[in-house]
Amino acid sequence: MHLRIHPRRSPPRRPAWTLGIWSLFWGCIVSSVWSSSNVASSSSSSPGSHSQQEHHFHGSKHHSVPISIYRSPVSLRGGHAGATYIFGKSGGLILYTWPANDRPSTRSDRLAVGFSTTVKDGILVRIDSAPGLGDFLQLHIEQGKIGVVFNIGTVDISIKEERTPVNDGKYHVVRFTRNGGNATLQVDNWPVNEHYPTGNTDNERLQMVKQKIPFKYNRPVEEWLQEKGRQLTIFNTQAQIAIGGKDKGRLFQGQLSGLYYDGLKVLNMAAENNPNIKINGSVRLVGEVPSVSGTTQTTSMPPEMSTTVMETTTTMATTTTRKNRSTASIQPTSDDLVSSAECSSDDEDFVECEPSTGRSDKSLSTSIFEGGYKAHAPKWESKDFRPNKVSETSRTTTTSLSPELIRFTASSSSGMVPKLPAGKMNNRDLKPQPDIVLLPLPTAYELDSTKLKSPLITSPMFRNVPTANPTEPGIRRVPGASEVIRESSSTTGMVVGIVAAAALCILILLYAMYKYRNRDEGSYQVDETRNYISNSAQSNGTLMKEKQASSKSGHKKQKNKDKEYYV
């Protein structure tokens, strides 16, 4: 058998275009990843750059804005924001009651809250145990200084910040921790106040009188002492949390933000209409706008909150305008912070707002508490945005009404019930203005080409928990939804670009694989005809040789016949 092997061609070198395709493929992937990371870093670094500039600009100015909004990052969105409530001059109360079968007993407690006030005496928060036990924990202001008093068994334990008064109208954050009888209290970034109880002398007294106690009473006495020791470390059967001090006659007047107690965000729960929370008196959630007279009341404020025009209970209103933002149910100019500064009346007086004249529509509105709680408005470098001075008669600065609000007011007389979204009081485009920072807390006014955003504040909680994020009346939005809407336009282009680049790379890769599989390769082939001829020749070897010899001789003879001779 003869095997004829065609020469196998060695595999050709990988052509240069294949290397080019691979390099293009990896280049697309690297560029896509780099562009996405670059966009993410730029979007995350922009707020930081604003805050750095604001600290630099405002290094020599110490102004505080009582009402602030913390716009949380992505990782903190979705239910983590706090709420801010304003307590008026007539006093108010937010009361949270634990269910009867879910009353906790704690060995350690953590309380934190942000506040701003000018009163010298008042109760901010008080936690009481079930009736008959007598355990309590109370955060209060006494003679302008913040302090905590608690009783978990026998005597009242007090801890107080003695250095500096806190009724200066500025925003402060107070943190209190308790572990047994030990306690700490800190205001802002000031030094921590600590309290450690003295040693228990019951055992020493027991040793002294033990000889006089009958033997059969020794065991009950020891058990009684052990029970007393347990009561000195455990806050038993907590029943309710009272905010505002109205139930005790020590009214708090000012604002409270982001209250946190042992995992409960009570102000958040109040803003969400928790069934275990009741609100009484002059209490208003920041972001709610009082209804115009003639319309139905859209807020949960009781009628006894009504006061006179001069007894305004609002703080500085940061009215902002957001353009080019719209959702299915939110107006483009929503997501603003308004504290009843659109009218010269109190936030509890639902009287009709009359439009004013002049240039007051270009300024921020401020109002103060009569007899105490005063809003500190920021100083503006630009004259166009300098707030109007507070008038001596009404002590309230008002803004002019937009045409939309005038139409709302006119429609109210005809029976219509409009809903006034927060921030509808000023719809003019605002020019960029200098950044503002609240000290000692890092705050900021975010700037844009056509809008002014509210400042940032740090959380009064222990681990950077955000505070006030007001919502619009009638619309309950998840905190952080505005940022998601604002970022969607920038991320959509990035996602489309990444998908297109990936699809192009995949097509190029498939084409390269197709060309590589269909290339020409060397092959082996067996010549069967030669195989049969050789088999027939092997049967008679001599015949084959004779045929070869005869063929050679015949060929020679033929050659000889063809020869020609010339003479």
From Swiss-Prot:
The chain crosses the membrane at residues 493-513. PROSITE patterns: LAM_G_DOMAIN. The lineage of its organism: Eukaryota, Metazoa, Chordata, Craniata, Vertebrata. Residues 36-492 are extracellular. Neuronal cell surface protein that may be involved in cell recognition and cell adhesion. May mediate intracellular signaling. Functions as part of a trans-synaptic complex by binding to cerebellins and postsynaptic GRID1. This interaction helps regulate the activity of NMDA and AMPA receptors at hippocampal synapses without affecting synapse formation. NRXN3B-CBLN2-GRID1 complex transduce presynaptic signals into postsynaptic AMPAR response. It is found in: Presynaptic cell membrane. The keyword Coiled coil does not apply. The gene is Nrxn3. It is a single-pass type I membrane protein. One of its GO terms (cellular component) is glutamatergic synapse. This is Neurexin-3-beta. Processed by alpha-secretase leading to the formation of an extracellular soluble protein as well as a C-terminal membrane-embedded fragment (CTF). Proteolysis of these CTFs by gamma-secretase releases intracellular domains (ICDs) and extracellular peptides. O-glycosylated; contains heparan sulfate. Heparan sulfate attachment is required for synapse development by mediating interactions with neuroligins. InterPro entries: ConA-like_dom_sf (IPR013320), Laminin_G (IPR001791), Neurexin-like (IPR003585), Neurexin-related_CASP (IPR050372), Syndecan/Neurexin_dom (IPR027789). Belongs to the neurexin family. Glycans are attached at residues 182, 280, 340. Weakly interacts with CBLN1 and CBLN2. Very weak binding, if any, to CBLN4. Specific isoforms bind neuroligins NLGN1, NLGN2 and NLGN3. Interacts with CLSTN3. Pfam families: Laminin_G_2, Syndecan. Residues 326-341 have a biased composition (Polar residues). Residues 41-64, 317-341, 535-567 are annotated as: Disordered.
